[in-house]
C-alpha cells in the first residue's frame, strides 16, 4: 500500500502541488514568525548585553512602584555627588555616571528627523572609549564639549558628514552641535528605526536639563570582588531614592520591558499563520474529497483484489503524510524569505524592528513542521474514511459514486448546533466577568473556530439559493455558458461550499478588522469634536505620540493672537493599591475642553488648586468616591499627597485624554521629576487662519520636535498609526486569501479532470473553446461571490458582537470598503479561473469523449 500511495502522488503531481501550496504558505508564516521574533529577541538581548558588558553593578533611581517605560513617568534622578562616594569604595575599580532622554535630531532642512514612530535616543558617553561605552565608533572621534556623535543609519539617510553641525533638541530650544563621529550600537545593525545621539556628560546634562544630576551610575568591580559583594558594598552608601542591581539583573530587567512586546508580536503573527493553516485545511479536505471521488473505481478494484478498508485508509494517510512532510519542508524554506518580508513590511509602515541577523532555532523548526504535518493529516481524515466505504462492486460499475455516510442526516442539525455553540463561546469570552487574558483568548479562539466550521458546513444548504441569486447575471448575460456555470456550482453543493468557505474565512476577518477600524476612527472624530470643540490648534510631538517639553507650550503662549493654551500632562500614579495613568491640566484647559459631568462642570478644571482632583465615573464607582472624597495618591518618586474630589465626569465612548485622576499642573510639577506635556491645545483670536498658523509656526521654530496641527490634521495624524496597523493586518490576512485563491484554482482543475467527458461532449455538440473558458470563469466567479457574500456578512455579525462588548467604539458600517471587498472577491474568481479555463478549452474532443 505504500507503493500504491507513492504512485498515487507521482501520478497526480499538479493536483498534489496545488494542494500543497496551502500548507506551504501556512508553515512559512509559522516559521517566519518564529524567525522574526527570535531575531528581535536576539537583537534586544545583544543591545542589553552590550550596554552592560563593562559593568558589574548599576545604580539607578528607585521608584515607589513599577512604572511603564512608555507611560510618561521616569525614575527620580541621582545626585551627581553620589558618583564620588561610589568611586571611593574599596571594592570599586571604576564608575561612570550618565544621563539619557529624548534627543530630537534636526535635518538640514530645519525639520525634525523622524522615522515612523521610533524614539530619538540621546545619552551621555562615558569618556569615549571607556569600558562602559556600548557604542562602536565607525568613523571620526568621540564627542567633546559641544560635539555629538550620531548613528550611521541617520548619516546615510540624511547625508550628514563629520565636521558638519546638526540641530539637537531635548528639553529646551534646539542647539547646534558639531558632528565629531559616526557610531553604531554594538553588534546590532539596526535598533528599530531609532536615532542615536551621544554627547559628553556636561553637554548631555545641559540638553536634558539635568545639571548636577545623573540617571545611572555604571560600576566595575576590582579583581576578586564578586558582583554580589560589590552590590552589598554600594548599598551602604545609597540614599533612599536610589537602588543598585548587578549588571546581569539590570540587563534582565531592561529585557523584561521588551519580552512582553515580543510575546505579543509572536502570538499576533502566529494567529495569522494559524488562520492560513486553518483555511488550508479546507483546501486539503476539498481536494482529497474530489480526488477520492474520482478514484472510486481504483479503490474498488483494490478492494476486489483483497485490500482491506484499513489498507485503503493507510494508503491515503500515507499520501497525506508524504505531502504534509514535503510541503512543510518547502514551507520552512519559504519561511526564511517570509521573515525578511515581515521585517520589510514593518519597516514600510514605520515600525522598524531591531535586527542583528536572522535566527532559526530548533523549536521553530519543530513547531512549524509539526503544525504543517498535523493539519494535513487531520484535514485528510474525513476524505480517507470516505474512501474506505467504497464497495468492491463499484469497480465494474460505470459512474460509480461514494455511498453516503450513515450519519449524513446529522450534518444539518450538527452544523447549526456547532455554529450556535461557537457564538455562545465567543459571547462568553466577551461578556463573562473576571476572565484572565489567557482564558479570554482561548474562549474567543474556540468560539471563532466553531463558528467558521459551523457556517462552512451550513454553507452547503445555502449554495443553491445563493448561486441562483449571484449567478443570475451570468445566466442572463453569459448565454449557455453562464447557465451551465450556475448549474455546475449547484450540482455538488458540498464541494462548492467547501471551496467558498476558504475565501469566506479570509474575507470575514478582513471585514471584521475594517469594521473595528471604521468604528475607532468614527468614534475618535466624535470625541475630538465633543471634547475639544473650542480648540483651534493642537501641539504634539512630530511622531504624534511622545511627550513634548513644557517650554513648547510656553513659547506658543507668547505668539501674537494666542488667547489660551491648555496643557495635559501625563504619567503614572498609585492609589487604592492600583497603578494607573494619571493626568494634570492647567487653568486654561477649562476653556478648551467640554466634558460630560456627572457632578461638577468645566469650571472645575480651572479651580483644582493644590489639592483638588476630578475623576472619571468608572474610577469613582470602583472606589465609592463622591464630591469631597479623599484620594491618597503616590507618585513614582515616592512622594505622595491627599487630594479631594471636586468633580466626576463620564468619559465619552471613544475614550478620554484624561486618566482616572486629574490634578492641577502646578501640583503635578511638585511631585514629578521633569514633567512634560502629552498635548497642548491653543485658542486663537480669529480661529483657524493662515496668519494664526504662521504665528504659531514662527513661535515654535526653535522646537522642531513639536508641530502645529489644525483639528482635522490632529485627527488624521492620531489615526495614522491605526492606518499603519490596518495595512499590516490586511497584508497578513491576504495570506489566507492567497490560500483560498489556490483552493479555487485547485478545485477548478480537479473538476475539469472530473468533467473531461462532459466537456468533450459539449465541444462535440458545438460549444466553442471560448464558451468553455467562459463557463469555467463564470463558475469560478459565482463560487468566489458565494464565499465573499458569506464572509462579508459573517464579518459584520462578528464585528457587531465585538463592538457591543467594547465600550469605546461605535458601530459604523464602512460601505465603500465592503463594496471593494465584494469586487475583490469577483476579481479573485476571475484570476483563479485563468489556468483551469485554458486547460479545459485545450482538451482534445476525441480523447475527452474516451476519457474514463
Where are these regions (language model features)?
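Alpha-helical transmembrane segments
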Residues: 27-58, 289, 338-347, 423-425, ...
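Juxtamembrane segments of multi-pass membrane proteins
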Residues: 449, 454-455, 461-609, 614-617, ...
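Alpha-helical transmembrane segments, especially those used as permease/efflux helices
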Residues: 11-18, 264-267, 363, 367-380, ...
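Hydrophobic alpha-helical bundles that form the membrane domains of multi-pass transporters
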Residues: 3-8, 12-29, 37, 163, ...
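Small-residue-rich transmembrane alpha-helices
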Residues: 288, 322-352, 364-389, 418-433, ...
